[in-house]
Amino acid sequence: MKLFQIFPLLLSLTSVTLAADDFCNATGFQGQSVVSTGHDVKKIGNIDYEQWADGGNNSATFYSDGSFKCNFSNTKDYLCRSGVAFSQAKYPSEIGHIEAEYRLVKKSASNVGYSYVGVYGWTLQSGISGVYEYYIVDNWLSQWRPGDWVGNTKFGDFTIDGGVYTVYKNVNGNLTQYFSLRKSERTCGTIDVTAHFAQWEKLGLKMPKITEIKVLAEAGNTGGGCSGSVEIPYAKIYINGKDQDGKSKGGSSSGGSNGQGLGNGQGNGQGQGNGQGQSATGSGKCPSTITSQGYKCCSSNCDIIYRDQSGDWGVENDEWCGCGSRVPKTTNCPSSIKNQGYKCCSDSCEIVLTDSDGDWGIENDEWCGCGIKNTTPTTTTKKSNNSQPTQGQSNNNSSTNTNFCSTSKHSGQSVTETSNKVGSIGGVGYELWADSGNNSATFYSDGSFSCSFRNAKDYLCRSGLSFDSTKTYQQLGHMYADFKLVKQNIQNVDYSYVGIYGWTRNPLVEFYVVDNWLSQWRPGDWVGNKKHGDFTIDGAKYTVYENTRTGPSIDGNTTFKQYFSIRQQARDCGTIDITAHFEQWEKLGMRMGKMHEAKVLGEAGSTGSGTSGTADFPYAKVYIK
């Protein structure tokens, strides 16, 4: 089951929730206090706390009500946390239902390269193999949300306890890390920790035994020291509705003295205590769309906690199971959707977008028609052979080499540029542009090119089709690009885009389709001030961003839009369906104008002293079919 298309009946296996203003306005810092200036793992009252840092001058004050204050100066990595620790590691199912409440006040932060604020824990006694560390991140002290660099496996976006989180796994030697990163930061709230554990388990991320559950503030910088101050005036960990002092959350407990919270089947020996223990073996019925994935059916009295295209789901014994016998059926949807090659959604679909074609949902990470809506069908012209570009048509309008990933080499006439230049060779448009440094680029009449840069703050070279800004992409025809990239001696690259680049007018838009990068990390959420999400475009997953910028453009210094599609998995060679990206953007309300250019691009930059290296493109074609 793929959870990025779930239609959540949100996990509600929790106790009564306190009204937000009961702790979101808390001033905290009550009771006894202790000041820590070194690496301390200690206890105050019933509260377990820790401060840890890699260098710098740091301190933290912890209070017996769970609240704490953290101050750090010139540290490479700093964390302070407060909550619950166990003398013996326990599996989450042995602990009960876990929740955290917190309030965050950011006081100051400078030179913070990465940061996590939320719930944290780790263990040396995993009960599996190796060391495990987990993060549920609701906020951050850095300028940008943590990006895909946190993990070497990205599972996608999931609705967990009412919020959308991106889930990652990272393995570094003996250390395994799990992350849930909230898409929209918040400074106060309740985190259903058990709901995250359950989601991770469903994705195959087996939960180890854990030794702590704490509210965390962490900040660091791999390039130098960071400094700042943060306060957590409210921090509580609840297990089965009770905090460390035995006080009930909201005046009620989520599990009795004998129960074990989230359906671990223990209760007082028969799964009947005051908790929510349930049968260890399902006795109910559920559709084969669930059992064929290896999941069991729940018991007959199960509670549905969300639905997707496979059926209805519950949780028993800390594992997902099929709840009920409803078999999803494919619904009908307008021909204006089916005629574009899209399928109809299942009968449990949720409408996420409405346009002139009808209502749209998402299932299996792909768009689908969600029910019948009476509309006037619109025709989308996907191919046209009548309109041609003003430049580059004669030698670059089609791809004839089907083996370009293995047999490519530069050919034809060539020209070498050593300064900023917009030109053409053999009907192929090209450009070299750089901000400082010693740079050059060689462009060939077959469309291929080679880019060399040294100590440049920003450098780009590109080759492809140029237009006269009189026709839309629909009028020009279906646009594709083939490319092959060879990276050589890349150094000190902080950001980079390799793929397709161009501009439109009316509206003025700068656009990127990014299939690779010369930097160590994939471009992150910092590229755009609006993140539309992840979409399957031409068979691959891309994250789509939109940005509004004021600065240099093809029409001088002005305000313009930027659109990005950033591929989740980099590739060195392939075919990009450019029109498919344009169509996806327009479906999201990102309007395209009249085409000025579409070119294969290599761009690299550094926020520091400058970047150096070579990006060779032995094959590059932009063409219209």
From Swiss-Prot:
Write out the catalysed reaction: Endohydrolysis of (1->4)-beta-D-xylosidic linkages in xylans
Biological process GO terms, please? xylan catabolic process
UniProt keyword annotations, A-Z: Carbohydrate metabolism, Glycosidase, Hydrolase, Polysaccharide degradation, Repeat, Signal, Xylan degradation
Region described as Linker: spans on this chain = 255-279, 374-403
Q: Where is this region: 2 X 10 AA tandem repeats of G-Q-G-[LQ]-G-N-G-Q-G-[NQ]?
A: 259-278
Q: Which residues lie in Gly residues bias regions? A: 252-276
Q: Where is the GH11 domain?
A: 35-231, 416-617
**sequence repeat residue intervals:** 259-268, 269-278
Source taxon at top rank: Eukaryota
**Residue ranges of every copy of the CBM10 domain listed in the record:** 285-324, 332-371
Task: Give, as one word, the top-level EC class.
Answer: hydrolase
- Per its UniProt record, what InterPro entries does this chain match? CBM10/Dockerin_dom (IPR002883), ConA-like_dom_sf (IPR013320), Dockerin_dom_fun_sf (IPR009034), GH11/12 (IPR013319), GH11_AS_1 (IPR018208), GH11_dom (IPR033123), Glyco_hydro_11 (IPR001137)
In short, the EC number is 3.2.1.8
> For this protein, what is any one GO molecular function term?
endo-1,4-beta-xylanase activity
Signal peptide segment: 1-19
Biological pathway: Glycan degradation; xylan degradation
Q: Which residues form the active site?
A: 510, 603
Q: Does the keyword Repeat apply?
A: yes
Xref: Pfam families: CBM_10, Glyco_hydro_11
Q: Where is this region: Disordered?
A: 245-283, 379-399
Q: What is known of its domains?
A: Consists of an N- and C-terminal catalytic domains linked to a middle reiterated domain. Only the C-terminal catalytic domain is active.
Family membership noted in the UniProt record: Belongs to the glycosyl hydrolase 11 (cellulase G) family.
Quote the PANTHER family the UniProt record gives. Answer: ENDO-1,4-BETA-XYLANASE A-RELATED
Functional description taken from the UniProt entry: Hydrolyzes 1,4-beta linked polysaccharide backbones of xylans, one of the major hemicellulose components in hardwoods and softwoods. It is more active against xylopentaose than xylotetraose, has trace activity against xylotriose. The major products released from hydrolysis of xylooligosaccharides are xylobiose and xylotriose. The reiterated 40 AA domain is involved in binding the cellulase-hemicellulase complex.
Identification of the protein by name = Endo-1,4-beta-xylanase A
